[in-house]
């Protein structure tokens, strides 16, 4: 069952789909320096063996940094994933961060389960004008 929405401050952008946040309304043991995985999308990994996917991973991380640019965020649909990680919809300025990454072609849809194939992002990038 998801928890109620919570205001948060991003401490660090780990990669395109993981943030470290502080949630001031939570006790420090639960609310400081908490890794949050974005719900609804998956970005390439920074250590992917394919240099083209690594470049997309860096672009996704930089995109998230620019979109956030020290703005407060809201966490929605907060829950735990299969590895007990916190997974949430992250909204900044009223926009869903996962949706923005998907629209930018820097992420693929992901609802858990088997790791998605990020190579489709390469096809989309080369097909773009």
Where would I find each of the regions flagged by the language model?
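Small beta-barrel nucleic-acid-binding modules, primarily SNase/OB-fold domains
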Residues: 1-129
